[in-house]
Amino acid sequence: MSDEQQQPVFSIEKVYVKDLSVEIPNAPRIYLERETPEVNIQLHSKSERIDETLYEVVLTTTVTAKIKDKTMFLVEIQQGGVFQIRHVPEAEMELVLGIACPNILFPYLREAVSDTVTRAGFHPVILNPVNFEALYYQRKQQTENSAAPQTPETQQITH
C-alpha cells in the first residue's frame, strides 16, 4: 500500500440535532417571576461505530433553570455528528472520539441551546467553553480509581 492510502483520514460527514425537547411546566405564571434562576447544566458525550470507517458522536446537554423549587424550563438537546475516521491508530481513536469530535460539535450544541431557550421565551443561556481534553483525562483518572466507573463513552459536567 502506498503512503497516501495509510495517511489518517478525518472528515465531518454530517452534523445534526438528533433530539430536542423543551419543558416549561409552570408556564405562563413562571414568566412573571423576576428572580434570577439557578441554572444547572449537564453535558454527556458518547460515541458509536456505525460502520467500518464511520462513527457517530453525540453530545447531550440537559439545562434546567429553577427559581426556588419551581422549574422555569428544562431543555435537553442531543447534537450529533457523523465522522469518517480511517487509518488512525487504535490507541489514538479514543482521543479523537472523546476530544476532537466533541470539540467540533460543541459550538453547534451551544447555538441550539441558546436558540431554544430564547424561543421558549427566556433570556438565552450561553454555554461556557468546555475543555474536552481536560474532561477526558479527568474521566480517565476517575475510571482508573473507581470500582464502578462511568462508561468510557460518557462524561458529565455540572455547572
UniProtKB/Swiss-Prot annotation:
Name of a matching Pfam family: SecB
Chief site of localization: cytoplasm
Keyword terms, alphabetized: Chaperone, Cytoplasm, Protein transport, Translocation, Transport
Subcellular location: Cytoplasm
Family: Belongs to the SecB family.
Domain of life of the native organism: Bacteria
InterPro entries: SecB, SecB-like_sf
Organism (species): Nitrosospira multiformis (strain ATCC 25196 / NCIMB 11849 / C 71)
Entry-linked PANTHER family: PROTEIN-EXPORT PROTEIN SECB (PTHR36918:SF1), PTHR36918
One GO location term (cellular component): cytoplasm
SUPFAM superfamilies according to UniProt: SecB-like
GO molecular function: unfolded protein binding
GO biological process per UniProt: protein folding; protein tetramerization; protein transport
Protein name: Protein-export protein SecB
Quaternary data: Homotetramer, a dimer of dimers. One homotetramer interacts with 1 SecA dimer.
Role of this protein: One of the proteins required for the normal export of preproteins out of the cell cytoplasm. It is a molecular chaperone that binds to a subset of precursor proteins, maintaining them in a translocation-competent state. It also specifically binds to its receptor SecA.
